[in-house]
Amino acid sequence: MPSLQDYHVPYPAAAPGQVRKVIYLPRQNPTVEQQHLRVQIIPGRHENCDDGRLYKLTGSVTEETLQGWGYSYYVVTLGDIYAAHRSSSDPARATTFVALDESPVIAYNSKLPIVVYVPEGAELRYRIWTDDASLAQSIQQKPEAPALPQPHLVPVTEGQECPQELPRCGAPSEYVRQDYKASMLSVEEVHRLSNNTPPLIPSAVHESAHEAHAAPPLHSAVLEEHGRPGMEHLEVCPKNNGSEGREQPAEEASTLKQRSSSSSSNPRHHSANESSPSRPRLSSTAYWPQENSKTKRSPSATHKPRRSTDSAAIEETGVGTPKKNRSSSGSASNKRKAEDDVYEKTMKNFWNRARSDSPRKASASSTKSGNGSKADPVDGK
């Protein structure tokens, strides 16, 4: 810390009853000291303030000039104490610093000390003021934070094991093994493993490479082909007296057709849907895939349908046919239904006549036998 003798300035000694106080200011930029910094001198003394009120001191601060040098120094005189205002202070601290009501603000000059002569028992305080410009400049002149050192990355080759000690900034993703390659399964192997089916033999492999790598068919179609072996040979039973048809085996359907053909004498006319070779009759398995309906036909499809199966066949084919064929098949079914009704009526009349003629023939034979020959006496007369 510097002393007053370092400046080689002959400041006067303190008068009796006074004390010399010296303030040493830190060195700053000369331009900043002249334009942006100021010093406030605050003389005062400690007083007992039991009531907790704030007080001020009367007195004055006088600036004097050292003759022959031109340097300034300040002389302070303190008077009586008075209450500044009625706001309360800290009551626990009864003895407080009471400042002079006059606190002069002087220029900031770090080249010279500030010399102040105060009465004995007094205390000198000061405050340094600055404006926003100097504050901004001091912020700009602050040294920047040192840059962090770059982490040292260890080069890792393919297949190298992860070291036991990793660097602090190293990422764990740098030590990943990349020499593992899993063999991929083909589509056929995946399908075979999912369905638990044995591997394909060479004769069952497709000839085309495109078909060999194609996706397998849907599981629903596979289940229908293998889970319903007896559905191919089922046909629709014809309607009898308004009852809906039920499914029967193909052999029983063929026997029923032969019986109906032997009992009927009139020829049958078939619709365009039934007679056309391009559209085979649909059975109860019409919802199967189209390939199965072409490749696997029921043995009864080669036989020509009779009258008794016309309505059932038309109803079955009407589900999957277009609108035009459906309307034509509907008109044909109505015509055949009317013919069937006429046929049934004639057969009923025939049987009724046969039943009604049987007692007449019996009575006629009895009358004929009575006229031609004499009857034997019953009583024996």
UniProtKB/Swiss-Prot annotation:
Ranges annotated as biased composition (Basic and acidic residues): 336-347
Record PANTHER family: ECOTIN, PTHR35890
Species name: Leishmania major
Domain of life where this protein originates: Eukaryota
GO biological process, one term: symbiont-mediated suppression of host complement activation
Xref: InterPro entries: Ecotin_C, Ecotin_sf, Prot_inh_ecotin
Pfam family of the protein (one): Ecotin
Protein name in the entry: Ecotin-like protein 3
Biased composition (Polar residues): 273-292, 363-372
Gene Ontology terms, MF aspect: serine-type endopeptidase inhibitor activity
Region annotation Disordered: where it falls in the sequence: 232-381
Residues in the signal sequence: none
Similarity comment: Belongs to the protease inhibitor I11 (ecotin) family.
